[in-house]
């Protein structure tokens, strides 16, 4: 029954989004449009818990992984092929921008948030679409959460291998990699085209290695845009979030320029559990990926290390 309900939910949300994206909606130029905040990071890095906490702030309107809205803005964003079988793009930049997608983005994302000062959108893989997002919202800010790469790759491995999330009519749907593993097809294609270890991708044969590659490409895109974004980018580690949540939330509020509520922070910190020790977990990667992976681990003071294949 659940897999049928999911099919109905995804189809209905997408059709409503497409309807709202059309020009017959209210004139957006007479409305107050919010500058968005994008919460990004490789999946399984803590964006969900951070998004949930920030969503409870009275000044913040929150959109949780609105794939249906993005697919209505531009079908090429449908990297899981949730709504149609399409040759979607994972890495997206300003070349994907169009005036039509700008208008659809404004209608679906920026309009209609009554009594809110901030729009927070959380789709982790948007870390690989910063150029596209910047074209749509040149004043947008970004919050990036980064977590130990081995922890991330193991979490992706568990999710992709267990694959318990089913959708009716999509027998070849994988919870992490999408229909017929299309997300991996796009990641390996777009990652290679962007120069991310093109000669080593074919050596990745399991979900943990592929998850580590997604982590590497995500961090590579963050580094590529770091200087350009400047003070529009705020970065935290998963360990900072779990080890000192109160200070982390205060700093984020200052970055977002929203009020700091002691009651909200006290309530929020109770929902964040300390990170579990994962020292000793292993990961094997091709030599080039392995070297870059361990450099990032050192950069963020993560203890685990990959070893070369």
What role is predicted for each listed range?
Residues 39-41, 119-122, 144-146, 235-238, ...:
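Short beta-strand segments
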Residues 1-106, 113, 162-166, 171-173, ...:
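PAPS-dependent sulfotransferase catalytic core
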Residues 122, 133-159, 252:
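Conserved phosphate-donor/acceptor-positioning beta-strand/loop module used by diverse small-molecule
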Residues 60, 140, 232-233:
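Short, conserved active-site loop motifs that form the nucleotide-linked donor/cofactor pocket
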Residues 57, 137, 230:
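Acidic-histidine catalytic/liganding microenvironments
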Residues 104-130:
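Glycine-rich phosphate-binding loop used to anchor ATP phosphates in small-molecule kinases
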Residues 48-51, 69-72, 127-130, 150-155, ...:
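Short catalytic/ligand-binding loop motif for oxyanion handling, primarily in non-cytosolic enzymes
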Residues 1-37, 165-175, 179-309:
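PAPS-dependent sulfotransferases, especially Golgi type II membrane carbohydrate sulfotransferases
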């Amino acid at each position: 029954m659940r897999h049928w309900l999911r099919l109905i939910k995804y189809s209905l949300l997408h059709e409503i989004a497409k309807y709202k994206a059309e020009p017959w909606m209210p004139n957006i130029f007479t409305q107050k449009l919010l500058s968005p905040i994008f919460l990004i990071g490789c999946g399984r890095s803590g964006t969900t818990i951070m998004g949930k906490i920030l969503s409870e702030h009275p000044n913040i309107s929150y959109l949780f992984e609105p794939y249906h809205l993005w697919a209505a803005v531009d079908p090429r964003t449908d990297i899981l092929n949730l709504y149609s079988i399409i040759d979607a793009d994972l890495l997206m930049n300003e070349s994907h921008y169009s005036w039509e997608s700008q208008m659809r983005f404004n209608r679906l994302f920026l309009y209609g948030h009554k009594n809110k000062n901030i729009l927070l959108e959380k789709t982790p893989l948007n870390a690989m679409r910063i150029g596209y997002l910047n074209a749509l919202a040149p004043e947008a800010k970004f919050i990036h959460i980064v977590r130990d790469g081995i922890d991330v790759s193991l979490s992706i491995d568990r999710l992709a291998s267990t694959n318990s999330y089913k959708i009716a009519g999509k027998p070849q749907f994988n919870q992490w990699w999408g229909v017929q593993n299309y997300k991996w097809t796009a990641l390996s294609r777009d990652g290679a085209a962007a120069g991310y270890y093109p000669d080593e991708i074919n050596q990745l044969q399991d979900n943990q290695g592929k998850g580590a590659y997604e982590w590497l490409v995500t961090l590579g895109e963050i580094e590529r845009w770091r200087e350009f974004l400047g003070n529009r980018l705020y970065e935290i580690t998963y360990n900072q979030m779990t080890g000192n949540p109160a200070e982390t939330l205060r700093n984020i509020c200052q970055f977002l320029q929203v009020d700091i509520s002691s009651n909200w922070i006290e309530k929020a910190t109770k929902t964040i559990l300390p990170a579990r020790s994962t020292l000793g977990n292993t990961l094997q990667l091709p030599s080039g990926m392995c070297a870059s992976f361990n450099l990032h681990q050192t950069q963020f003071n993560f203890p685990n290390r990959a070893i070369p294949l």
